Every structure is written in C-alpha cells, then in structure tokens.
Amino acid sequence: MSELKNDRFLRALMRQPVDVTPVWMMRQAGRYLPEYRASRARAGSFMDLCKNAEFACEVTLQPLERFELDAAILFSDILTIPDAMGLGLYFETGEGPRFKKTVRTEADVNALHMPDADTDLGYVMNAVRTIRRELNGRVPLIGFSGSPWTLATYMVEGGSSKDFREIKKLAYGQPELLHLLLDKLADSVADYLNAQIRAGAQAVQIFDTWGGALTAAGYLEFSLAYMKKIVSKLQREADGRPVPVILFTKNGGQWLEHIADAGADALGLDWTTEISEARRRVGDRVSLQGNMDPAALYAPPAAIRDQVSRILASFGSGSGHVFNLGHGITPDVDPEHAKVFIDAVHELSAPYHQNA
C-alpha cells in the first residue's frame, strides 16, 4: 500500500499533533454534486453504484477532486448487511429504503442468513481495495457500518420510520427476541468492519442514526451495549499504524460520558451539542468529530465562515478535533458553499495548532 501523504485525519483521531484541523463531510459523495448525479444516471440505480467497484470508486473520489478534504469515505449504504441477510433491499422513489421481508418473530430472526463479509459482501471489499489503490496514499479511507440498533430499526419496521412503533413493541414486549437479533447483527457488523480493514480501510465509523429515539436506559441496553461488543472485536492496527474507531449516535449528546467509555477513539457529535461542553465532559478520553449544522451550508459564504470560526473557538486549542457536519450534507446545497466550509476549516484552524 502507498505511503499516506496526508495523515492529519488519523492523527487527530488519536489526539496527536496536527498543523490544521482535518475536515471531511458525511455524505460528501452524494446528490449535491452534479458529477455524482451523472455517475448515478450511468450506473442505473443507487445499488448498482454501490455494487460496482469502479462506480463506487468513481463517486468516492469525486469530492476529493473538488475539495481539499482530509479523508475519503467508502461509498456504500448502511443496509448492505440486512440485504445480505436475505431481506431484499429496494428503494422506493420518495420513500427511501424498503425491505421485502420484515423481522418480527423468533422464526424471522432464526431464518436470517449470517453473511460472510468476504463473499456475500465481497462487492464492498472490492470497492475498498479499488478505492485504496486509486487514492494512492492521498488521504485515508474510512470504512463504515450501521449500528445493530439502527439496522434493526429498518429490519423490524420494513424501512424508515417516524415513530419506531414495531421495534419498540419488541423492546418493551419481547426484549429477549430483540437482543437475539441485535446479537446477530453485532457479530455481522464486527466481521464486516474487520473485512473492510483487511481490504484497506484505515479508520471505521459506526453510524447509530436512530439511537437517539431510545430512552436513556434503552440506549444503554439496546444500542450502546452492542456497539461496545463490536468495538471489542475490531482489528485496531493495520499497515503498522492504529485503525481508529468513531462512534456516531445522532441525538446522543446526553449520553456522551457513556459513549466515551465504549472503547472507541472518537465520538461523532450532531449540532445539538456544544462542542466545548462535549470536550469538557469527555476530557481527553476520546477525540470529537463534528459538528456544524448541515443547514448552515445554505447560508452566504461569510456566514458559513462565521459558523466554522465559532465551532473552532468552542473546541479550543490542541488536537483531538475532526471537523465535520453534524449529519450528512443535504442534496440541494451549492457545492461552492461546501468548498467555502472546507477551506475555512483549514484556514481558520491553524492558530489553534501553533504549539503542535
């Protein structure tokens, strides 16, 4: 593998000195880019983009051609595991992801195929290898998965949900059945992420998009416990350097102390938590990633720079911060505004690293 030319993202995750604060964006390869829309039209569908290594590589690299990003993230979907388990993933226009089958009974859980990450999900590993080769050491590559709880919400509900009624029926009425499902998912996610690391991912992120829908006790029992299990099983070194792990629970700001004790290297923050407060609460146990409101990218350039400046000042001096949005970039954002954001992070953060 090529030597890494820009490692500030990995260094910041490990709280090592950096020259400027590194930055990347969730969904940085996505519909806001006209070149992405052109690639998707050529591929035919979203899943065709994901399952073809050349297309997945092409769209992963597109934002790096436009912006001075400090990391690339594998282009894929969090629902690849449930799809490989036999649930039949498809996308309904205007409805988002759907499954042909749902998982609501013990028989449904027992019928799930336990996927082999290197064969059933081999298309993902092919994409990782292709992207690493094409990156040629330019920036690190992030692999990822959904959290067991988040994957389970889609599997039980049959797709996206506003109130999580069906999975909460299990949580309150048949918790042992939900634990059976979550345990299977935790094993699959750990295998999947380790396969990505073997294929070349240099950091991994677990997206717990719907953890914030739980009560405090429910979060610890049904979400965080299974992310901890995954973290404990991950390969934490490759190519002679650490492979950092990031946990991101949307709307999880009230549980930062618990998440900081889960064994990961960094926590993702959404925009509802003040980053200075988060830093005070977790100390130097973990790095922090985030946390500008994606909607701030609709603002004029000067206002975007002001938002970046405010968050940098809130975090303060020293390493341990990876700048990001608090969730994915939205499809109707002007790419030029994304460029203003990324350039502002590098330009305005240098004074905070003068003693590096």
From Swiss-Prot:
Keyword Metal-binding belongs to the record: no
Subcellular location as annotated: Cytoplasm
Pfam families in the cross-refs: URO-D
Enzyme Commission number(s) of this protein: 4.1.1.37
Subunit structure: Homodimer.
Protein name as annotated: Uroporphyrinogen decarboxylase
Species: Hahella chejuensis (strain KCTC 2396)
Catalysed transformations (reactions): uroporphyrinogen III + 4 H(+) = coproporphyrinogen III + 4 CO2
